[in-house]
Amino acid sequence: TKVGDQLIKHIVFWRLNESAYGNDKQTNAQTLKEKLLAMQGKVDGLLKVEVGFDFSNEKDSCEVVLYSEFTSKEALSRYQIHPDHEEIKKWLSEVRYERRVVDYEI
């Protein structure tokens, strides 16, 4: 699924608040997963969206991870400014208390 010589990977980790919007952490994690998976097919160059939940309960773990692949840095930029992605970010501002991201090229 690699296009040309570039494949961009965008990985984001979140730690979630115990509750937000009247929902518990697990409910908000599931809602986040649904919102992120719904981005598939909406952005040209977005190849893959995968969302997982941590089961380790390590003290340094995050509850939710997004793994996504893009055909180019430009495709990642289109994703970042897509209106649906902007809505997710706004929603997340109340749900998460920590975010870590890594973008890299292979």
Where are these regions (language model features)?
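Glycine-rich, flexible loop/turn motifs
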Residues: 51, 88, 100
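Short S/T/G/P-rich N-terminal loop/turn motif that feeds into the first structured element of a domain
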Residues: 1-62, 71-78, 104-106
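C-terminal structural segments of small proteins and small subunits
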Residues: 70-95
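Charge-dense polyanion-binding interfaces
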Residues: 93-106
